[in-house]
Swiss-Prot record:
One of its GO terms (molecular function) is proton-transporting ATP synthase activity, rotational mechanism. Belongs to the ATPase alpha/beta chains family. The lineage of its organism: Bacteria, Bacillati, Cyanobacteriota, Cyanophyceae, Acaryochloridales. Optimum temperature is 55 degrees Celsius, activity was detected from 4 to 95 degrees Celsius. It comes from Thermosynechococcus vestitus (strain NIES-2133 / IAM M-273 / BP-1). Disulfide bonds: none annotated. This is ATP synthase subunit beta. The keyword Ubl conjugation does not apply. F-type ATPases have 2 components, CF(1) - the catalytic core - and CF(0) - the membrane proton channel. CF(1) has five subunits: alpha(3), beta(3), gamma(1), delta(1), epsilon(1). CF(0) has four main subunits: a(1), b(1), b'(1) and c(9-12). Pfam families: ATP-synt_ab, ATP-synt_ab_N, ATP-synt_VA_C. Its EC number is 7.1.2.2. HAMAP family: ATP_synth_beta_bact. Transmembrane segments: none annotated.
Length: 482
């Protein structure tokens, strides 16, 4: 939220080039880089115009070049510009929960003003080395497939890959629900350069599933910050920082565990590339900005665990033309601790969450971090599923009967594992009617060990579908027998 500035430093517009505005100030009164500038006046039609810009370059001759955070329609040369003397600041604290904001921290959900007592600037340094939590610890999500095969690091960054309609949103909402109920944490969702319709759908789905309480927003579990596709590149480039600033307050002041969702991290890079070209910088590889690594690093280095609390970030990653060597995803990968890949073939089988157990990775899956038992169980599950995958062509051509006894047993266990990796979600209760399940890591490991050891070879595979822990699978098998 840009506070109405005192008119101590006033300049005027000298040039407008799309979303970029050049402004001249009196000699000796140049605003600092990243300062917010406020332009207010009337356009040619006599209508009020109010635009906030951010200083990006000092051009010399008392002129600065700034990037607008909203449309520059109606701006004319000679219009007055007020230097606010500070960067863009956004409201922070529990008053932000259940509300939707734009890049400037202004509410856009037509629910009135926000009762936040504090605002913070969106440009802040990353925590110092002495404040960081150095011991890696696993962040339990209660989702079996994630906790077993791609454990999330507390304060880590996870890339979420998946096409349309494979369940990205549902996984996000389940994580938001679980961090609130099991960890007493909150979430912040930064919608960076995605479709307005999707933002609206997400908000309505969150109300339906109880993540947002429409009647009493303070009971909500999430704050939303949107900068959609139709916004100028300045807004799309900065909205990620606005969301991150809100998350940092929950971590540093409220000392909570925070989940920060960024959808989509590629659009953040894309917006930076547009702004870079508008500012006249020489493009780098594939037309990206020369400061690509710095821009991504400035955002990513602030997402971390401190000794007080943590920000664990889940970032949807769009891969242009499926080219993983493109500079935008390649730069992002350098910061990720793990990847959660969603598979359309699993979704088609009705196995939700449709996380690909062989395609997803995590650098937390090491015996010295998760323990020998967890590590060996996860690797055995992956080996069984990999063998099943190799045998599928033979099964398709010759049938199951042509397999050796050992391979038939592997296939039977793999099919049970595949089904046991599914589970009913709390946020999907309203659609499926099945109560959601939170499964602890201990129960998850125990369940898969029992399947691998052959203890449950006599149970039908449908008993493992859409259940929580292994005891529920046994109970379901008893029911199926009856």
């Amino acid at each position: 939220m840009v506070i109405s500035a005192e008119r101590t430093n006033v300049g005027f517009i000298t040039q407008v080039i799309g979303p970029v505005v050049d402004i001249e100030f009196p000699s000796g009164k140049m605003p600092a880089i990243y300062n917010a500038l406020r332009i207010q006046g009337k356009n040619a039609a006599g209508l009020d115009v109010a635009v906030t810009c951010e200083v990006q370059q000092l051009l010399g001759d008392n002129r600065v070049r700034a990037v607008a955070m909203s449309s520059t329609d109606g701006l004319v040369r000679g219009m007055e510009v007020v230097d606010t003397g500070a960067p863009i600041s956004v409201p922070v604290g529990t008053a932000t929960l259940g509300r939707i904001f734009n890049v400037l921290g202004e509410p856009v959900d037509e629910k009135g003003a926000v009762n936040a007592t504090e605002t913070l600037p969106i440009h802040r340094p990353a925590p110092s080395f002495t404040q960081l939590e150095t011991k890696p610890s696993v962040f339990e999500t209660g989702i079996k497939v994630i906790d077993l095969l791609t454990p999330y690091r507390r304060g880590g960054k996870i890339g979420l890959f998946g096409g349309a309609g494979v369940g990205k949103t549902v996984i996000m909402m389940e994580l938001i629900n679980n961090i609130a109920t099991q960890h007493g944490g909150v979430s912040v969702f930064a919608g960076v350069g995605e479709r307005t319709r999707e933002g609206n759908d997400l908000y309505n789905e969150m109300i339906e599933s109880g993540v947002i309480d429409k009647d009493d927003p303070s009971k909500s579990k999430i704050a939303l910050v949107y900068g959609q596709m139709n916004e100028p590149p300045g807004a799309r480039m900065r909205v990620g920082l606005s969301g991150l600033t809100m998350a940092e307050y929950f971590r540093d002041v409220n000392k909570q565990d925070v989940l920060l969702f960024i959808d989509n991290i590629f659009r953040f890079v894309q917006a930076g590339s547009e702004v870079s070209a508008l500012l006249g910088r020489m493009p780098s590889a594939v037309g990206y900005q020369p400061t690509l690594g710095t821009d991504v690093g400035a955002l990513q280095e602030r997402i971390t665990s401190t000794t007080e609390g943590s920000i664990t970030s889940i970032q949807a990653v769009y891969v242009p033309a499926d080219d993983l060597t493109d500079p935008a995803p390649a730069t992002t990968f350098a910061h990720l601790d793990g990847t959660t890949v969603l598979s359309r073939s699993l979704a088609a089988k009705g196995i939700y969450p449709a996380v690909d157990p062989l395609g997803s990775t995590s650098n937390m899956l090491q015996p010295d971090i998760v323990g020998e038992e967890h590590y060996q169980t996860a690797r055995a599950v992956q080996a069984t599923l990999q063998r099943y995958k190799e045998l599928q062509d033979i099964i398709a051509i010759l049938g199951l009967d042509e397999l050796s006894e050992e391979d038939r047993l592997t296939v039977a266990r793999a099919r049970k594992i595949e089904r046991f990796l599914s589970q009913p979600f709390f946020v999907a209760e309203v659609f499926t009617g099945a109560p959601g399940k939170y499964v602890t890591l201990e129960e998850t490991i125990k369940g898969f060990q029992m399947i691998l050891s052959g203890e449950l070879d006599d149970l039908p595979e449908q008993a493992f579908y859409m259940v929580g822990n292994i005891e529920e699978a046994k109970a379901k098998a008893e029911k199926l027998k009856a």
